[in-house]
């Protein structure tokens, strides 16, 4: 007997889209066939809907413990599952204290085990003061180590100098874990910001001038050189320029172990939009011009970009309402919108449905060792997202399940809506409802092959 039998959905799999039934036993997919026979404890009619693997967001900031007034794991994970996500990996810096050792790691893990509606992995930090703690973070189950090549925005999460980064990469290599880097040149961004502010610059355009594309390109080039020299696995987060992606793709072609991430906001918005909408679109690296948006989409179609992470990083309203744009918190609330953006903008830009499933689920799960996640195959976890591809809708504040009801996507028309999300077969979201309490589990990365 099946625990769950999903009937007649259009299953989005690696090889294409097929109408089929899907059977689940003890939280896992056990069988896929055009028509399954047998009894089931629950039967779900998916005719007319597309069934995607649950999205895996490898880059979120849910700010717990310590800053739950900014977001929190409960509200952040509710928004994730409402947007079709079933797994997230939380970054180490915005919790208080940041995740720099086993004690802080386990405190975050325990909070997530209480509060999360999705399964989860956790990043550890890489800073000048915790090089000796990387082995214990690996032992605790960190999915990798996050570091900043420019100022993180928080004094308690310092950026490593090149020596620290070099040493950290050597350790990460030996531990078999990935180093994720925010790649912007600190010297360039700090120097320009100081000069522009000294001249009285406080606006959006001034902020954009303080973080030019060369700051990203220079840092990416340096990060790739360090990864090539050390043999470390490198993950470049939120790339915003075509030149940076090209550098990384060329390095990969010559054998550097590098993966490339961009974010939905770099695929949807420009610096002009930031001038129009203001603080809701402030991020670092900043938004670029339309030619860079086109270059990123071209890189996705070419297979150079591996993952799409939301980089969800909200704050309290007071931090978004500063008169000086340099003092506005730089973070975009987008965890609920990643799959929706891909279903709308991605299809318009020529992506197939299997492409979308690969970017949002299969590749991040596989690359980061999250066993059983990201695919619709026998043996995989029954993480399912039912989508009405033809439904057009306008994003309103009432749709949001984050703590703060602001998002750059409000008022935008989308095509394709998440109807239901299942985590290991159980409904965690259905048409605005969350029928069960949090049941998220901690995911340790599988050992590197």
From Swiss-Prot:
Could you list this entry's UniProt keywords, alphabetically sorted. Hydrolase, Metal-binding, Plasmid, Purine metabolism, Zinc
GO annotation, cellular component aspect: cytoplasm
Residues binding Zn(2+) 2 = 146, 182, 238
Q: Which residues carry this modification: N6-carboxylysine?
A: 146
Tell whether Hydrolase is among the UniProt keywords. Answer: yes
- Identify the residues that bind Zn(2+) 1: 59, 61, 146, 311
The cofactor required is: Zn(2+)
Quickly give the catalysed reaction: (S)-allantoin + H2O = allantoate + H(+)
Q: How cofactor binds (record note)?
A: Binds 2 Zn(2+) ions per subunit.
Coiled coil residues, start to end = none
Which Gene Ontology BP annotations are present?
Answer: allantoin catabolic process; purine nucleobase catabolic process
User: InterPro entries given for it?
Assistant: Allantoinase, Allantoinase_bact, Amidohydro-rel, DHOase/Allantoinase_Hydrolase, Dihydroorotase_CS, Metal-dep_hydrolase_composite, Metal_Hydrolase
Give the highest taxon in the source lineage: Bacteria
Q: Is the Zinc keyword given for this protein?
A: yes
The annotated pathway is:
Nitrogen metabolism; (S)-allantoin degradation; allantoate from (S)-allantoin: step 1/1
Q: What is its EC number?
A: 3.5.2.5
Its PTM note reads: Carboxylation allows a single lysine to coordinate two zinc ions.
GO: which molecular function terms?
A: allantoinase activity; cobalt ion binding; zinc ion binding
Give the similarity note. Belongs to the metallo-dependent hydrolases superfamily. Allantoinase family.
Function per UniProt: Catalyzes the conversion of allantoin (5-ureidohydantoin) to allantoic acid by hydrolytic cleavage of the five-member hydantoin ring.
What quaternary arrangement does the UniProt entry report? Homotetramer.
Q: What is this protein called?
A: Allantoinase
Q: Which organism is it from?
A: Deinococcus geothermalis (strain DSM 11300 / CIP 105573 / AG-3a)
């Amino acid at each position: 007997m099946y625990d769950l039998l999903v009937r007649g959905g259009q299953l989005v799999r690696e090889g294409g889209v097929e109408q089929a039934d899907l059977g689940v036993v003890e939280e896992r997919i056990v069988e896929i066939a055009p028509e399954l026979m047998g009894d089931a404890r629950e039967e779900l009619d998916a005719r007319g809907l597309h069934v995607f693997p649950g999205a895996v967001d490898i880059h979120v900031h849910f700010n717990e413990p310590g800053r739950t007034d900014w977001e929190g794991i409960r509200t952040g994970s509710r928004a994730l599952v409402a947007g079709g996500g079933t797994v997230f990996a939380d970054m180490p810096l915005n919790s208080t204290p940041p995740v720099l050792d086993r004690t802080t790691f386990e405190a975050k893990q325990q909070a997530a085990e209480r509060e999360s509606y999705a399964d989860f992995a956790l990043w550890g930090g890489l800073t000048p003061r915790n090089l000796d703690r990387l082995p214990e973070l690996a032992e605790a189950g960190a999915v990798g180590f996050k570091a900043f090549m420019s100022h993180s925005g928080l004094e308690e999460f310092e950026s490593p100098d090149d020596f620290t980064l070099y040493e950290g990469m050597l350790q990460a290599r030996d531990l078999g874990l990935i180093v994720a880097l925010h790649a912007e040149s600190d010297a360039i961004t700090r120097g320009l910001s100081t000069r522009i502010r000294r001249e009285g610059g406080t606006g959006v355009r001034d902020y954009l001038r303080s973080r030019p594309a060369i700051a990203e390109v220079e840092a990416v080039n340096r990060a790739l050189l360090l990864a090539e020299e050390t043999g470390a696995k490198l993950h470049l987060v939120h790339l915003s320029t075509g030149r940076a992606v090209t550098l990384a793709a060329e390095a990969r072609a010559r054998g550097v172990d590098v993966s490339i991430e961009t974010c939905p906001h770099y695929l949807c918005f420009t610096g002009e939009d930031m001038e129009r909408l203001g603080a809701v679109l402030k991020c670092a690296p900043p938004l670029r011009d339309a030619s860079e948006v086109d270059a990123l989409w071209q890189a996705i179609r070419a297979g150079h970009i591996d993952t799409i992470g939301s980089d969800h990083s909200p704050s309290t309203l007071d931090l978004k309402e500063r008169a000086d744009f340099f003092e506005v918190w730089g973070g975009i609330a987008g965890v609920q919108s990643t799959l929706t953006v891909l279903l709308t903008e991605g299809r318009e830009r020529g992506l197939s449905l299997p492409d979308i499933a690969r970017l949002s689920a299969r590749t991040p799960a596989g690359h980061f060792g999250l066993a059983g996640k990201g695919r619709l195959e026998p043996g995989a976890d029954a993480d399912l997202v039912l989508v009405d591809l033809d439904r057009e809708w306008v994003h309103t504040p009432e749709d949001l399940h984050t703590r703060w009801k602001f998002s750059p996507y409000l008022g935008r028309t989308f095509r394709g809506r998440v109807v239901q999300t299942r985590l290991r077969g159980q409904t965690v979201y259905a048409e605005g409802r969350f029928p069960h309490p949090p049941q998220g589990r901690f995911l340790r990365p599988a050992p590197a092959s």
